[in-house]
Regions:
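Short, structured secondary-structure boundary patches
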Residues: 9-12, 74-77, 109-116
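Conserved C-terminal helix/tail region of periplasmic/extracytoplasmic solute-binding proteins
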Residues: 85-116
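A glycine-rich, aromatic-flanked flexible loop/lid motif
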Residues: 1-2, 51
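A bilobed periplasmic-binding-protein/Venus flytrap-type ligand-binding module shared by bacterial periplasmic
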Residues: 2-18
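Secondary-structure end/capping motifs
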Residues: 14-91
Length: 116
């Protein structure tokens, strides 16, 4: 998985419905990018987020937007935390980061709700 969505503990605790809605919107946008990359690129170009339509379309087609359900998000965090620790950029272990800084319940619920 390439991307991470982060929210403060306090916000997520106080606003679980808003948190889940935001995550759902992002995941649905991923599905639009996968199902209709031309539409997604038009929106990016029209809003000035991308200049070259051909390059943006090629990129949109090559990125695995529809595969978010297939990724093991915990394994991804573990992998990158280990690399960051090996590089001396963090001191926490991957296990501590996962135990103290992750909450998979929204992703797991949406995997069930948003059937692919």
């Amino acid at each position: 998985m390439c991307c991470i969505l982060a929210g403060s503990r306090e916000f997520v605790r106080k606003n679980p419905v808003a948190t889940k809605r935001a995550l759902r919107a992002i995941l649905k946008a991923n599905e639009i990018c996968a199902a209709d990359p031309e539409r997604a690129v038009r929106a990016l170009v029209d809003r000035g987020y991308a200049r070259g339509q051909d390059t943006a379309l090629q990129l949109m087609r090559e990125l695995p937007y529809a595969r978010w359900r297939d990724y093991d998000t915990e394994a991804t965090v573990r992998f990158y935390a280990l690399r960051l620790r090996e590089a001396g950029m963090i001191t926490s272990t991957p296990q501590r980061i996962i135990a103290g800084s992750t909450d998979w319940r929204f992703v797991n619920e949406l995997k069930r709700e948003l059937k692919g």
